[in-house]
Amino acid sequence: MIRHGEKVLVDIAFSIRSSLALVGMSGSGKSLTLKAMLNMLPSTMHKMMDVTSDFELIRGENVALIPQNPFTSLNPMSRIKHQFFVQQEEAESLMEMVGLEREMLERFPAELSGGQLQRVVIAIALSHKPRLLMLDEPTTALDSRTKENILSLLKEIREKLGFYMLFVSHDIASVESLCEEIVVLKDGKVVEAGALNEVIENPKESYTKALIESNFKNREWRK
């Protein structure tokens, strides 16, 4: 068990075999789970963990995180070079991979749209050459069209580079095309898990069913 204020995680265990969606409604424990995996919780909380049996803590150069709230300082090129000490040519290549034109490389974040800024964040994550890419609600603040573009970009890049993926979201519709497996959280507990398509088509728990219905309401493309 891991406790953080009023929030508690209980007996959470899962494997990331390829691409996994970690979903649940607000307050379900998604972000707390992610922080626990990344060893980002306050040091006082480590005493509440049974050594590392609750989570195999993920550290080091194998992991990159795309946070919910992107950075606000340094222009794109400087940010990539500053954070991971990559060469100019590599930084330009990364920006090209995420679909940003060269003229945008020297702009500051305040001059970029939400979609452009998220592409920069993706480039920064890729500069780390991760084996596992973790995403924390990366499309929450984007409009529907930009959101679809970012999700398509992530799918294309993952198919090209072949990294593992953990996608944290409250929106199952966002992860449907990206992830093969799903873990559903409620009040810090796993209530359902399995192949994503199977869970969407045949949810066993009423909580999962309600989450799916709220996500796919009025979506004509889901039949």
Where are these regions (language model features)?
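ABC ATPase "signature
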Residues: 193-194
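A short, proline-enriched helix->beta-strand linker immediately N-terminal to the Walker B motif
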Residues: 127-131
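Conserved ABC ATPase signature
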Residues: 108-112, 116
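C-terminal boundary and immediately downstream tail of ABC-type ATPase nucleotide-binding domains
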Residues: 200-223
